[in-house]
A protein has these predicted regions:
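N-terminal secretory/targeting leader peptides
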Residues: 11, 26-119, 127-292
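C-terminal segment of classical bacterial N-terminal signal peptides
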Residues: 14-24
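Short beta-strand-centered segments that line the small-molecule binding cleft or hinge
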Residues: 122
Length: 292
């Protein structure tokens, strides 16, 4: 009787152990929604897709990335709020978009601060540059890394050869006091508008121009509705990849390391794409014959 009872207990324990193991193996993967506002063929779009691929590879499927391009999920003006609410887990807004959360990153909006992307790299890889990734910690956000898009150019409805040519023109800008002051300094009227509305605003002549990289000007077809582009390289358009502190710390140590490794490789890939696309898209715009 005692032997039979012991065997039953052992059998039950074995069955429970097997069941627990099966449940653990069948646990749902962690879902990571990555939201961005640009096309998939841009540096950010290609980086996000590479990140999705590498996370699947490095985590063995324990973390699954879903990418939402072209403002399908959120625009940059709403995504950080959504992130803090847990509706999205990762994004890469332009550095100008963080002005509601910190003043530190406004430095990147200053015109003619960087000569080229090499000088940007030197700063971002410095102790000060890396320290700026922590500027959002008190707001519940974690900066994970920088991504280039490129140097900004000016597109407009009339030629811009000297600063005075911008006088009286309406330019779309991101929400940034620095960018606002930049255009006001040359007599232009800056208007803060979402990126997703820029093409329509240009097409309907609600605005006269905008500033952007070669990649965005080409991928969003701004060159089709703007007869003039001035190669000014006057400013930088970079992004910061961010997540919420709650989501980041909710990953296991192993998952966090794997996702971080995937991101670093993806950012290196994306930055190379940014370099190549600046050259390629500039030439495609020139070859189109639509702009001067």
């Amino acid at each position: 009787m005692i032997r039979s009872l012991s065997m039953a207990v052992v059998g039950l324990a074995t069955m429970l152990s097997s069941t627990v193991s099966t449940v653990a193996l069948a646990a749902d993967p962690v879902l990571l929604k990555f939201s961005h506002v640009v096309a998939e063929n841009t540096p950010k779009g290609q980086m996000a897709n590479k990140f999705k691929e590498l996370v699947a590879e490095k985590t063995g499927g324990s973390v699954v990335v879903e990418v939402y391009p072209n403002s399908q999920l959120f625009g940059d003006d709403k995504v950080l709020e959504a992130m803090l609410l847990g509706d999205v887990q990762m994004a890469a807004p332009a550095l100008s978009k963080f002005s509601r959360y910190t003043d530190e990153l406004a430095l990147y909006d200053l015109p003619f601060l960087f000569r080229n992307l090499d000088s940007v790299d030197r700063f971002q890889q410095s102790e000060k540059g890396q320290g700026m990734l922590d500027a959002l910690q008190k707001k519940g956000l974690v900066g994970l890394g920088y991504l280039h898009n490129g140097m900004k150019q000016l597109s407009s409805s009339k030629p811009l050869r000297v600063p005075a040519d911008a006088d009286g023109l309406k330019f779309r800008i991101m929400s940034s006091e620095v960018l606002e002051a930049q255009f006001e300094a040359v007599g232009a009227a800056p208007l803060k508008k979402p990126f997703s509305e820029v093409f329509t605003l240009l097409q309907t002549r609600a605005i006269d121009g905008q500033e952007n990289t070669w990649s965005n000007i080409y991928s969003k077809k701004f060159f089709e509705v703007q007869p003039y582009i001035t190669e000014s390289n006057h400013g930088l358009l970079d992004y910061m990849v961010v997540t919420s502190k709650e989501f980041w710390m909710g990953l296991s140590d192993e998952q966090r390391a794997q996702v971080q490794e995937a991101l670093m490789e993806s950012l290196a890939f994306g930055n190379q794409v940014a370099h190549d696309k600046a050259i390629e898209d500039k030439q495609l715009i020139a070859d189109s014959g639509r702009t001067e």
